[in-house]
Amino acid sequence: MEFLPLFHNLRGSRVLVVGGGEIALRKSRLIADAGAVLRVVAPEIEAQLSELVVQSGGEMILRGYSESDLDGCVLIIAATDDEPLNAQVSHDARLRCVPVNVVDAPALCTVIFPAIVDRSPLVIAVSSGGDAPVLARLIRAKLETWIPSTYGQLAGLAARFRNQVKGLFPNVQQRRAFWEDVFQGAIADRQLAGQGAEAERLLIAKIAGEPPPETGEVYLVGAGPGDPDLLTFRALRLMQQADVVLYDRLVAPTILDLCRRDAERVYVGKRRAEHAVPQEQINQQLVALAKQGKRVVRLKGGDPFIFGRGGEEIEELAVHGIPFQVVPGITAASGCAAYAGIPLTHRDHAQSVRFITGHLKDGTTDLPWSDLVAPAQTLVFYMGLIGLPVICEELIRHGRSADTPAALVQQGTTVNQRVFTGTLANLPQLVAEHEVHAPTLVIIGEVVKLREKLAWFEGAQATV
C-alpha cells in the first residue's frame, strides 16, 4: 500500500491553494465543503473561485507565489500549469513538513485526493494512488448507484444513539452485534425508506429491550415498461433483499432475474377477462406473507399507481397495519413513447396529454368522448388493443378527424419493440395486418408525425 487512507478534520483550518483557474476552483470546492478557510494565491483569480474564497471566510492574494504564503496553513495544494512553480511549492511544503498535493503530479505529492462518495457522515474514498484516477472515478460512479443517499441519515441516526448503546453494552462484541442487527433489519429499512421518525422509534424500543415487531414489510415496486435499465436504484435494491416476489404478466423475465436468487417467486399475472389470481386474493396474500415476517416485493409493470391497482393493495395493507413502501416506475406511456420517438407533448402540436384505460365493458367504453376530441392534446390508451375499433369509431364520431395520426407500440422499450403508425381510420386494420398483440400502447395525436424524424431506438421491427 503506497498511500495510507486518512480522513482529516479541516474545519476552521487554513488551506493554501496556489493557482486561480479551473483546476484550482475544482480543488477549492472540495476543501471548502470540508469547512476549511481558503487562502488562494495567483496573479489572476477567476470569479467563481473568488466567490468561494469569500464564502469560506478566506483571503485572496493577487500576485505570484511566495514561500511565506505557507505560513499558518495545514495543507498545501499546487494547482497551476506551471511545472517549475508546482515543484517549488512541493519542495517548500516538504521542508516545513506540511502535507502537499500537486495536481496531476503524484511524485510531487505527500497526499493525494481520492474519488469520494459523500453520504455524510458516511464518506467513502476510492484511490488508485494517482496511477489511474479515471478508474477510481468509474468505481466511485458504481458506488454512487449502489449506496442510497439516505445512508447518510442512517449513519446520523446511529451517531445520535452511539453513546447510549455504548453504555448499555460495555463489551465490544455485543455492541458490534447490536449495530449489525440494526443496519440489516427493520430499523435500517425504515430509515432508508425515508421514515426517519419510525426508524428512531424502533431503535429506542430496541435499546429498551422491547421485542422486535414480527411483521414484515411489503414493497410495491414499479418495474417500468420493460427495459431493465429503466429500473430505479431503489427498486433494484428492494428487489434484491426480498424474501418473496409477487409479479405480474407484464414484468419482463430480464427484470425478474434481477430479484434475489433465492427469493420465492409467485406469479399473480392477469389477462383481459381472465385473472390468474383475483385481486382480493392478491391483497390477502400480501397481508399473510408480511404477517409471517417476510419482506415482500409486489412487482408491477410500469408504475403501480397508474392503472396498476396499487392503491387497492396498499389500502388493504394499511387496514392491517402492515408497513409498506411504494417505489414509482416509469409508466408505459412515457417509456414507450420515448423509445418510439414520439414526444407526448410538443409546443407546436400538443399542450396536454391524457392517459386512458381502453378496457371494454359490455362491448363499449364509458369515456368522456367530447373531451377527448379537444385539439392540441395527445391521447394514450392503456389496454386498448381489444377495444381499438370502438375507440377509433367513437373519436371520429365525436369530431376527431379520421386522418389524425396514431401509433401502436408493441412491447415498447424492449428488443422486441414494434411500432406501427397510421391514422384513426386505419389503425384497427394495422392490428390485423401485422398481428399486433398485447402488451401494446395506443398513441393518438399530431405528435405521432414527429416519429418520422425522431425515431432512435431499433427494436425487432418498425413500420412507418
From Swiss-Prot:
Listed GO biological process terms: cobalamin biosynthetic process; methylation; siroheme biosynthetic process
Region described as Precorrin-2 dehydrogenase /sirohydrochlorin ferrochelatase: spans on this chain: 1-203
SUPFAM superfamilies: NAD(P)-binding Rossmann-fold domains (SSF51735), Siroheme synthase middle domains-like (SSF75615), Tetrapyrrole methylase (SSF53790)
Active-site residues from the entry: 248 (proton acceptor), 270 (proton donor)
Cited CDD domains: SUMT
Spans annotated as Uroporphyrinogen-III C-methyltransferase: 216-464
Catalysed reactions, as listed in the record: uroporphyrinogen III + 2 S-adenosyl-L-methionine = precorrin-2 + 2 S-adenosyl-L-homocysteine + H(+); precorrin-2 + NAD(+) = sirohydrochlorin + NADH + 2 H(+); siroheme + 2 H(+) = sirohydrochlorin + Fe(2+)
Enzyme Commission number(s): 2.1.1.107, 1.3.1.76, 4.99.1.4
Keyword NAD: yes
Known function: Then it catalyzes the NAD-dependent ring dehydrogenation of precorrin-2 to yield sirohydrochlorin. Finally, it catalyzes the ferrochelation of sirohydrochlorin to yield siroheme.
Protein name: Siroheme synthase
Gene assigned in the entry: cysG
